[in-house]
């Protein structure tokens, strides 16, 4: 510190203290008696202010208050007070000085200042004792009277300044940290790349390089590394004389220069202190000795051989095999690669069959009539109601114009193929139907009924289609019949098949005209033969009807052409007379039954031999019981069914049957009987057409007849 600053600090600190009244007195005395000292202390104060600007502003509040007071007074004493106040919290050593000065400042003059400066360093170590002694000394001081020359404004300002008190001292926090130890575990490590230096090359790769290029590897590391002291002792043992060492140094330097300064051994720089202690002198000497040994060692090594250049021509590029892209199936990409445990199992029903997905319901397609109804429902209905009665009359007239069909009942056998279609009236064919009639007719028609098959889902149609597929049944062809169940042909003794005894003569195919001529030539008898008179056209029509009812498809005759056809009235009369002569047809009970009932009845009519139904099937143990029971019972008369059932006549061609009766011309009574016989024959032919399974029914009837006959014989025998 400057001596001026050292003098200025105690003067300014003298005025500060715990008792403001004592400060006032000393300030006033100093201001009056020593104005020169206050002027001399101003430059150091300004210097200290500049020094404090760089420091942190800890006490801003006291500065502002003291500046305000100094502006009001405008005196040198006040300026000194503000300078001393602002300079207070600089160092803890300075804070202790003003506490000790009030006791030493009793004598006035520069001696008190010098005593304060000398006493400060000695008492700096006991700040607590000084604080305790201050208040007692301050109370013991007598209060001198205030000067009469001071105004009341200054006294008021002094009192106001005294009420502010001293700025609080900032004590530095000197408490030691007792928390956990903070450590930074992160550390940077340098990892050298493989092969960057020769040391980092792996041994196996080094062998390959030595074989190809002949480069020798680095020398192997020593097993036990020597310390610095051991190396110095080993090297310095040979250097007992100083002269060879010097010569060795010179030789080493010359060799290093001649080799182009390939290898240079630098001595380690030693940082020497100004006055090293006695303990470190020995270590410095050892370092100097080690430098000399290293230089001698480097001189003895000689020059380093230059590395040979690599011959790049001998290096061959390694040709790697070209890689091909192969598609590898991933697990789960296909169904086959999915493990069995993870496969999705389809939903099955009770029988284990997979459930078909329910088809989505498709909207039903609307018909034209429905679309027309929807489009026309918004129109007014008054016009349609008015127009409806008009076409009804027209339709009734048109219906009346159509000729009514024949009212008389004609048997089906005679009216099957020759009934003429009523011709359409010319008025309906030529005249166009008016629009009003069409609208009325469309309004009277009901809505189209939905087709039940139309709304069925696709799955049902597929099922129905599969049901309609035809398949060859077992036994339908001879190839499908097992060999054990095939019919064996009749063979002679030599094993040759027997030929039919009388080969059937094939009749030539006759045309319709020849058949009609053959049938009509026998009707040339006398008029007394029959009471009916027919024209040739009527007769041909009647004969064609009979021929059309025959089972032979070739002999069916169609109606005559329209040019030769007679009038409808005459034909109807002829047919009526012919139908009257035939008599009424007996209805066939099996004709109107559905196909399912026939199949069921046929299944019921099939006969199977039951146990005990015949004598052959009765066990011998139970035969005597039946014999005893039959002796007690009276004999039953033969049933009516057995009498009525007769063997049906053999099938005969209806044409032959008809033509056989027409060879002779019997009387009228005989002709009527013949017509009745013809009627019965034609009915049998028609019934054979209606019932396809008639042969099986006959077989069942024969079996029942045969079974009834032995039973009746047994009863008669018993």
Swiss-Prot record:
Residues 30-61, 68-104, 320-331, 342-377, 384-399, 446-496, 566-579, 587-650, 706-718 have a biased composition (Basic and acidic residues). It comes from the Eukaryota. Coiled coil: none annotated. Inhibitory domain repeats lie at residues 170-222, 307-359, 450-503, 587-640. The modification Blocked amino end (Ser) is found at residue 290. The modification Phosphoserine is found at residues 86, 133, 222, 243, 367, 369, 376, 444, 520, 531, 579, 581. GO terms for cellular component: cytoplasm. GO terms for molecular function: calcium-dependent cysteine-type endopeptidase inhibitor activity. Pfam families: Calpain_inhib. Transmembrane segments: none annotated. This is Calpastatin. Keywords: Acetylation, Isopeptide bond, Phosphoprotein, Protease inhibitor, Repeat, Thiol protease inhibitor, Ubl conjugation. Residues 20-29 have a biased composition (Basic residues). The lineage of its organism: Eukaryota, Metazoa, Chordata, Craniata, Vertebrata. The modification N6-acetyllysine is found at residue 49. Specific inhibition of calpain (calcium-dependent cysteine protease). Plays a key role in postmortem tenderization of meat and have been proposed to be involved in muscle protein degradation in living tissue. Each of the four flexible inhibitory domains can inhibit one calcium-bound calpain molecule by occupying both sides of the active site. Residues 1-189, 210-238, 266-291, 320-509, 543-718 are annotated as: Disordered. It comes from Oryctolagus cuniculus. Belongs to the protease inhibitor I27 (calpastatin) family. Signal peptide: none annotated. The keyword Mitochondrion does not apply. There is a cross-link at residue 32 (Glycyl lysine isopeptide (Lys-Gly) (interchain with G-Cter in SUMO2)).
